[in-house]
Regions:
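Helix-loop boundary and gating motifs at the non-cytosolic
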Residues: 8-58, 218-223, 227-260
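Conserved MFS/SLC helix-loop-helix module at the cytosolic interface between two early adjacent transmembrane helices
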Residues: 63-99
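Juxtamembrane intracellular "pre-TM" segments in multi-pass secondary transporters
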Residues: 1-11, 193-222, 416-421
Length: 421
């Protein structure tokens, strides 16, 4: 009972959505960290080719996000129908990857996955915002992200065991496709449309022009692309680095890699809600500064994991722990900031552009990381120092965002802090 009292009192539909996201993310966790290893070490493609193929999902994701951003603000489409279509497309992408044996098929599967994900994220984030009052919005996003992390963690653990025992990569991809179909059923049966029937609608490109003319939002977009490039390293570059370069080239086994990422997700689960509550007194910009600091420290420890003569596993554990804190600090803060900036009638457009940052970050991140992993150990190790070197850039942009939000707050009486979200 004490645990139940500790949980926020959210709309019932948010809990149902979180349950569906958890089940879907179990399927994603089956394959998320193993796709690069499978297609490089088992299928025989180069790390550069696989990185580019994984990044191709971002191209179709951009299309999906633009389509989804307009669709979810339209009463004719809305949040629910967009979510249902996204699940069907994502399941097709998983099944395509399950039977891929060459680069063309790998790219096709990733293009479908990217399109489905592009439609999914703006719609699901809009549903959470629609159903949560301002004072609960940060915790509502934390709960849905918590469900994502629990599902991913379970999927990673189960996936690593099955891969260690049977190398059943393709079976896990099929299971991922089935998880999307299960989520489709939950959405169809239990999630009603949340868009307001009388909501004002902006036709044509007007809504996009308003969003792209928002100076605060544009500054946020710049730093968000950088942070999502960091996020992309976790499931695209890090698994291959751990396998082929960690411990001065000795690497870790698939089971060890799976355990490391289960640890990472476990900490993200443990910290998600406490960190969301801890960040309430801080401005959104300060919350993102905290996140970016932990990203930089984590990347530095990954470099040590590769070059240290001993203790590589310990450094990997510490690095992924810090990255879990970075992720838990980032996700609810970023989503709540975007909703705070967006007019209600343009919530889908703003969330779509926010999601585009993920598409761009996941286009740049795997391509850069894959190219680095095709280089000699010195360059592969140095890649992490390059990421550390980008941290001051992110902090500088966030200081500019903080000043801009303070100016807007003084002129509009709006307060851009987590306790108003």
């Amino acid at each position: 009972m004490n645990l139940l009292r500790w949980l926020p009192n959210l709309n019932r539909t948010i809990w149902i959505l979180a349950a569906g996201r958890l089940l879907s993310q179990v399927g994603t966790g089956f394959t998320l960290f193993y796709l690069p290893i499978f297609f490089v070490n088992e299928v025989g493609l180069s790390a550069t080719a696989v990185g580019a193929a994984l990044g191709s999902a971002s191209l179709s994701g951009m299309v999906g996000r633009f389509w989804g951003g307009a669709a979810i603000d339209s009463p004719a489409w809305g949040r629910r129908r967009t979510l249902l279509i996204s699940m069907l497309i994502s399941s097709l992408g998983s099944f395509a990857l399950a039977f891929a044996n060459d680069l063309v098929a790998l790219v096709l599967g990733n293009l479908l996955m990217g399109l489905g994900i592009g439609l999914y994220w703006p719609a699901t984030e809009a549903v959470v915002a629609d159903l949560s009052p301002l004072e609960q919005r940060g915790e509502a996003y934390a709960i849905t992200r918590l469900a994502d992390s629990i599902g991913l963690g379970l999927g990673v653990v189960l996936g690593s065991v099955l891969i260690a025992l049977a190398h059943a990569y393709r079976a896990l991809l099929i299971a991922d496709g089935l998880s999307f179909l299960i989520f489709f059923g939950i959405l169809y049966a239990f999630i009603a449309e949340t868009i307001k029937p009388n909501q004002k609608q902006h036709t044509g490109l007007k809504g996009w022009k308003i969003a792209l003319g928002d100076r605060s939002f544009l500054i946020y977009i710049a730093v968000n692309i950088l942070i999502t490039t960091y996020l992309a390293q976790i499931n695209s570059t890090l698994p291959l680095y751990f396998k082929n370069f960690a411990r001065q080239g000795l690497g870790f086994s698939e089971l060890t890699i799976g355990t490391l990422f289960a640890w990472h997700l476990g900490l993200a689960i443990l910290f998600q809600l406490p960190i969301a509550r801890w960040l309430k007194p801080y401005s959104y910009a300060r919350g993102l500064m905290i996140s970016i600091f932990f990203w930089g420290t984590g990347f530095g420890l990954i470099w040590i994991c590769g070059v240290a003569p001993a203790g590589g596993l310990i450094w990997a554990v510490l690095a992924l722990g810090l990255m879990a804190i970075a992720m838990a600090s980032y996700t609810p803060t970023a989503s709540a900031l975007v909703v705070a900036l967006a007019p209600d009638s343009l919530r889908g457009v703003y969330l779509s552009l926010n999601s585009q940052c993920w598409a761009i970050g996941y286009l740049i991140g795997p391509a850069l990381g894959g190219a680095a992993m095709d280089r000699p150990p010195g360059l592969a190790n140095g890649y992490w120092l390059m990421l550390v070197g980008s941290i001051p850039v992110g902090l500088t942009i966030l200081k500019a965002l903080e000043r801009q939000l303070q100016r807007v707050s003084r002129s509009t009486d709006l307060e851009y802090t987590n306790h108003s979200s």
